[in-house]
């Protein structure tokens, strides 16, 4: 659209457009078609891999290995590209980090960790580990050491919390991979080869955000096949886009975005696509209570090329132990929190005096935390900000404490609109929201 506006093409009927404008429209249409074709091809390939590799292991349990190996390949190639570009700009035109000795690579460690947030020695890059994997009788141990070294590379640095534990769920010694070391290593070789053969490099060089797109697709498929548990970590793309669009009406940029129950981060990352990540000036913030899903969220940030210093995802219970007191207020807050979750409520005498909840004069019921999330979001919203939250319909009509909280919200004109979504939109539930 920007191209068309610059050439004054967008305001004319198609039959009156000049040749140059028609050619640009044709190019744009062809580009969109190419993107969809590449995306469809990538999706077919990666889901086939996920199904072929898991064997008798439940897909939901095996997802950690597919997603973890995808992450390992991404950070390896991302780091290699960064170092190669830097060296080649300096005049070393034939430089290739993958072929550098580990000893020489050590000289750049400190500066690279400061910039990229992690470091991988050449011998431990995905491409080099894969090249030797088939003949490595101790491949499981090799990978365990590599993952440990990647995590240790950031100890004491600003990015330590962003990388810590990201490989914990990828247990290379698990019986899920096989009953013997030999069987596990065979599965790991297949996994390395399958992820390595994906044409992600070609896609990244051309028209789609390949690594991030592959990750989002895999999580969509895992959520749709996991039933109820899938909805705990993933918000459908259509809903994510709606929430993001609502919060940025009339805005071309925001200071920070926040999700207090961020799951895998799909809602937060929608802002990077809708606004452009550079227009979320101070970054992406979230908190997730489930440790495995918290790890998935941080991986998702890296795979969408969000630098470590531009996101802050915390682990813990947002309602009783919020981690971002020093980061609020936020211009845009979005969330799809768990429906009617139990929480401490008046069982914790400190909460009634918590500045997030005290303005309403009551706490959300112990068995229904829905409006506790709403009050938390309202408290951390900037004066010019907008929040959009997915709620269980019961918050609109239930009595007791929830009725009093609703009255507080309405009397103070905090509610702009209520939108009813269709049933069957969310994984694992048929209820409307």
Positions of predicted regions on the chain:
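Non-catalytic, mostly N-terminal accessory regions of nucleic-acid modification and defense proteins
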Residues: 2-242, 246-247, 309-318, 420-424
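Conserved Class I SAM-dependent methyltransferase catalytic core
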Residues: 45, 52, 61-74, 363-431
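Tryptophan-centered motif/residue detector
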Residues: 47, 60, 294, 343-344, ...
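A generic secondary-structure signal for well-formed alpha-helical elements
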Residues: 73-86, 222, 251, 275, ...
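Conserved S-adenosyl-L-methionine
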Residues: 229-335, 340-342, 346-351, 357, ...
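Short, surface-exposed amphipathic charged segments that create phosphate/polyanion-binding patches used
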Residues: 327-329, 430-433
